[in-house]
Amino acid sequence: MCESCQRPASNGIIVPRDSGPLTTSALEKSQKQTAQCKQEQPGAAVPGQSSQVRRPHSRGRVRSAGARPRRPDVRSMTRPADRVISLFTFAVGVNICLGFTANRIKRAEGWDEGPPTVLSDSPWTNTSGSCKGRCFELQEVGPPDCRCDNLCKSYSSCCHDFDELCLKTAGGWECTKDRCGEVRNEDNACHCSEDCLARGDCCTNYQVVCKGETHWVDDNCEEIKTPECPAGFVRPPLIIFSVDGFRASYMKKGSKVMPNIEKLRSCGTHSPYMRPVYPTKTFPNLYTLATGLYPESHGIVGNSMYDPVFDATFHLRGREKFNHRWWGGQPLWITATKQGVKAGTFFWSVVIPHERRILTVLQWLTLPDDGRPSVYAFYSEQPDFSGHKYGPFGPEMTNPLREIDKTVGQLMDGLKQLKLHRCVNVIFVGDHGMEDVTCDRTEFLSNYLTNVDDITLVPGTLGRIRPRFNNNAKYDPKAIIANLTCKKPDQHFKPYMKQHLPKRLHYANNRRIEDIHLLVDRRWHVARKPLDVYKKPSGKCFFQGDHGFDNKVNSMQTVFVGYGPTFKYKTKVPPFENIELYNVMCDLLGLKPAPNNGTHGSLNHLLRTNTFRPTMPEEVTRPNYPGIMYLQSDFDLGCNCDDKVEPKNKLDELNRRLHIKGSTEAETRKFRGSKNENKENVNGNFEPRKERHLLYGRPAVLYRTRYDILYHTDFESGYSEIFLMPLWTSYTISKQAEVSGIPEYLTSCVRPDVRVSPSFSQSCLAYKNDKQMSYGFLFPPYLSSSPEAKYDAFLVTNMVPMYPAFKRIWNYFQRVLVKKYASERNGVNVISGPIFDYDYDGLHDTQDKIKQYVEGSSIPVPTHYYSIITSCLDFTQPADKCDGPLSVSSFILPHRPDNEESCNSSEDESQWVEELMKMHTARVRDIEQLTSLDFFRKTSRSYPEILTLKTYLHTYESEI
């Protein structure tokens, strides 16, 4: 599921291991270190204190809090704790959200309904010192001395004169004609005196009003091919301008409402939207932006969460959020500091006005070379505040968007004033979107359960359920799930055990994620009972908007704009997920990223020049290429089709076909000595072409195992001798392909594969013993190109275990949807195979992790099946003749014994299967992590472009 792996520390915080592929030698080294890893005594792993980092396995992936260690690790990420709480002031912005939504739906243990407060666990601080000459100092001063940095309010540790000296507002924030050339007044918030440029404290519009310059927004777009920085700047500084709750569709308001932001967008690099991580809440997403980690990996799985090991609850208003033990991973400001790059503050107390934040960043940019940071951040609580209060479509939203744009204009005017507007890189980014939600659209669990007082529900736009009392022996998650599943025709939530959630959410492998999870329909809330929802005395709701829904929902998408000398000029890029931004920010600063969930290099197309060039991972296991090695009599399948073959001498010919090392019709005919060289394929499925079924190269196996390449006329497979089934099966279907029927005599039997040892083959006997299990085929017999080729589809090496209920899904996909996609896209290549993820960590399971087998056999039962469907992006080109960019859609389908996830599964498959598949859409990278395979290894496209393809998620949503 991600690019790196983690191990839990003794306090439960998990930190990532190095990302990237392992070479064989690195893998051996990793395996040798495993024993040492298990003996280490981990310490606290917090952002800024000692952490444990794991070395990568073949594809790498970050482990989450509470997960079992799987890979060795080494010590790293040590820094002073003085920067740790930078992130905690996110609470400032989130308290606003809390005021309109979270505290209006009570949890079982109750919400704090008091006014926002500043909480601190810091020791008592003497505030008798002074902030004179110290306002917004970059070095945090520890107790017992008082502080003057931007976080002192959060810790109640400011010097007594902080407000007087550092939060000045006299004179306002802008110059007027009357103020130009004024006598310096130190009580003013900013200055318009003749010496203000030299002293670095001018109001941002000083040169516009007093010197006749133009506003930045009024200048034409200019292509900045190289940074134009003053002397002393080692690298272009990076300013991250983050906005809370900025729905991507707000950008449609354009230059009439947001002229400065629109200029950044049109002159720089932008995407139609950026996808947040799930849950689409503020704390998880802001920390994901800072670390590149999924919430299950960095540990901040929600704005509110309970840790069963700590026996403590993390709240936006509680003191626990200040405890380092909750925060995992390595945020950008620590990565910078560890590599000798100074970082300014990232987050601000709400009492500091936006104008003061901008002026402070600009003043930091004028510091001497040895004290000037290279990375800064600005955070705005808007438009989230107004979005919750008025809803995303309320006319009241225009003013807060104008205010944000005004602040952006102040920043850009200030940079131009300092002659840094061609030097600095600016990222304008949101954390999540906003949806139209009111308390009138609330589902109450009391309408489904009789014992809601026995549970604790984290309510709202998603639901997380745990027992109210930890020692409740009667608490039965499966029974609760059953009582919440498909009980009403108009039900607006869907219950899941967390391991059954769509894999694309990456929201299971953390002890802070409750076992029961409710995915709530957009525009709806969930609560325990009506008394848990507060309303105004008039009966109206306190809020009109909220967020937290499925991260593929279009209303949850947010904004990304990159502007500056390192970003491309006037460039639109495809949407991407926010886990990828950490690597980009590191590239902009010349840093080596800490291990993270992003795919480094997948966003290279955003930048004018790239300091990081990704390389393809090395193959760990090469395949065997077996010929005919066994006799028919060696096999006892219990359901042999050989006696159904007519005429009898045709059996030898069918087996000889399997000896062909290649997949072209010409090679097959040459081997068989066929006289029908020009025989037309009546189904149109076959188009002679070498490697026709591996259009993008053979998938590489990135772990040690044994597997064989098995060629057939209509498909090719990588057959595992360990798992007794293909790791992958690939086939190409043309637009003209026809779906054919299956002869009755082939519906209940399979053929032995004389290339594979009977000891490495499945048997129908096992399925006869297991009444709950059946089998299916990875290549669909329905799409066979000829009667002879259909026999290949019934080889035992094409067989995989499947629950009867799941076969309904799989057969409909193969029989109907593959043909549909091939027709729509001018042919497709399909790669399908099994997934084993019993510990639901998003990583490929080794054999010791597998918990279920076909009864009385060594045939493992997959937890999921995957399918990757690729075509030419230009549908006028056939899939097997594409010379341009590719288009991909992928699925990770849960392999379960029932279809209760779809409430209408009793109906015809056409009514529900495709919708179920869309729910379980996935990235190719997700599949690679779950299989330890590497796809698309031989294409005409650059490797960074292939990484972009692999990280693409087809959301099946309407336009933003």
Located regions from the model:
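Secreted, short cysteine-rich peptides and small extracellular cysteine-rich domains stabilized by multiple disulfide
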Residues: 127-214
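Active-site-proximal N-terminal segment of extracellular/periplasmic enzymes that hydrolyze or transfer
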Residues: 219-269
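Domain-level detector for secreted/extracellular nuclease and nuclease-toxin modules, and
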Residues: 440, 621, 626-632, 639-960
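A long, amphipathic alpha-helix that forms part
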Residues: 231, 354-369, 376, 383-424, ...
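Short, structured active-site-proximal loop/turn typified by the sulfatase FGly-forming signature C/S-X-P-X-R
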Residues: 249-297
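N-terminal signal peptide
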Residues: 90-125, 129, 169-170
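His/Asp/Glu-rich, glycine-adjacent segments
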Residues: 288, 292-391, 489
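Active-site neighborhoods of enzymes that stabilize oxyanions during catalysis
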Residues: 457-571, 576-584
